[in-house]
Amino acid sequence: MTFRSLALPLLLAAAGSAHAVEVPIGDFFKDPEFKNVSLSPSGEYITVSVPQGDRTVLAAFRVADMQLVGKWDYGEKKHIDEVVWVNDERFFMYVSRKLGRFDFHVGTPDVYASNVDGTKRMDVPNGGTYSIRALTPDDPSNIVVERSSGLGDTVLSKLNVYNGQVRTIATVAIFDADFVVTDDGEPMYAHGTEKDLTQVTMRRAGDNKWTTIHTSNESGSEHVPRRMHGDGERVVFEVSKAGEPMQVVLMDPATGESTPLSSNPNVESTNFLTSSDRKDLLAVRYHDGIPNYDFVDETHPESLTYAGLINAFPDLAVAFPGISWDGKKVLVYAYSDVDPGSYYLFDRETGKAKFLLAGREWIKPEQMSEMKPIVVTARDGRKLHGYITIPRDSDGRDLPLILHPHGGPHGPRDGWGFNPEVQFLANRGFAVLQINFRGSGGYGTAFEQSGYRKWGTAMIDDMTDAVDWAIREGIADKDRICTYGASYGGYAALQTVVREPTKYQCTIGYVGVYDIPLMFKDGDIPQSDWGRNYLRKVHPETLAEQQAQSPAFNIDRIRIPVMLVHGEKDERVPMSQYDRLHDGLVKAGRPPEMIVLEDKEGHGFYDLQNQVDLYTKMEAFLDRHIGDGAAAPVSP
């Protein structure tokens, strides 16, 4: 790892032009050297998550000389996903177990506390059930945390970060609540989701009793308290009347009046940028095409600093993962569609930025392909946002196209930034189409819920409409189109073919769901109340409808070459899903090409050699059917 000191005007070097170069597959998929940098409250230290195959370890560095001061490793399949500094010498680590590259954590994460030099390590009792609600700089031994009791309510407590002792502050009768607290940790509001997914907002009155002020069932609207204003009286809410993207408002509880602060007609906020003393809301971040900030307080000194830093990186998206508590040091992350990103530490007193780390220094932006935001109109008039990536140095006309739906599907979305799979496919000459179909997250509750019970119908039609757009625009050759996705994207890759049997020349399903009724019986989702409620909410009620939306029950409509990829250790989408589709295709006399790893891999492959083997075979498969190796269009 290298570091250097740079003045702001010299932060960016102009990239020279370059002809398309075939980049080795391993360069796209090998782990970054680091990710998830966090800054200590003094700005003296950083922590860095370091992926190492089937685990992610943590390292701490002293910023002045980038010397290692501590390292933490919790073993195989354990990943240190998040670090939260609780005072200037100590932080919490959230350690989860994951069984695949596309997996969310399995079970409740473990939480450990440690000093930055590795001393005074502690297993935080029940730590994975806690969410940190507030830090208390005036009381560095304690933080304010919340956790669901398991009895239908949520408890707010003070937690001693050195001995793990807990003292209850308040309890609210909401199953899974987030509290809004004052600077000294006193709860004022609570908002959460009940087991039936109803949203509830409550306010704490002067007599310490909680009063319900809003429920989503009664109003059909959303009314979510986010944080107290710096005056200690008014409250920042996000509100939506009919499921449209929520707008940020400042509410005065004394009068009930709300003042608009920020909104975007297309997307919801992704996070808030606050002052170093955490009192003032400075800006709201949106991911509308390319990520950006909307400053709500343009005159605050720290807002001026942030705006200047954004202007210093004109061709990159800029995020601010941390600021020292005295406001003097700002952690800056700058990245783009062709640049995996670098971290800098900006000193507000000197006006200079020190380069800290770049996670994938071997990636050359001038060899990558531009990802362009697009807007597509669906057949029912709904506006769909997405991205098209055109191979570098191509003329962008009549290209072989990969429709690449994202996983999830509810909550996640595709965004602008460096995507190894997309860049690999573009580097091999394929245009890549990503569309945020209805059901995707980030575009408001109404948009997300419009995909419920329509996994295999309207959501798929959105993808088809996006492909038709690419054909009309002259980007895609209509006789050279394949689909590829993972998890829900793997399901969609097959269901697009079921719904449009003659439109595609091949399809690839990676750890995909292919039998919706089986989701209610197998895998880790139906093992929890939340998971069972989720399945009932997003899938059709009748077995016949579920089967109609399942590729495994529509084998007769899948008449093109299929590749299936799965890991035998997958708990999110178990091998039974793969078996249902594979066996059906074999019985129909159309056996798929298959990659099944039986030993270590789960919901997405971790091992680099396994990934290289997978994408090598994928490249050959795509080339045979829509690439240079395709002798003629494949007839269904």
What are these regions (language model features)?
Residues 32, 54, 97-98, 103-110, ...:
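Peripheral, non-catalytic segments that deliver or gate enzyme domains
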Residues 26-56, 330:
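Beta-strand-rich domains and repeat architectures in extracellular enzymes and scaffolds
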Residues 7-15:
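Bacterial N-terminal signal peptides
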Residues 16-20:
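Sec/Tat signal peptide C-region and signal peptidase I cleavage site
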Residues 437-636:
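Active-site-proximal cap/loop segments of hydrolase catalytic domains
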Residues 363-479, 486-487, 521-529:
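Cap/lid segment of the alpha/beta-hydrolase catalytic domain
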Residues 49-70:
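Beta-propeller domains
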Residues 67-100:
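Blade-loop segments of beta-propeller domains
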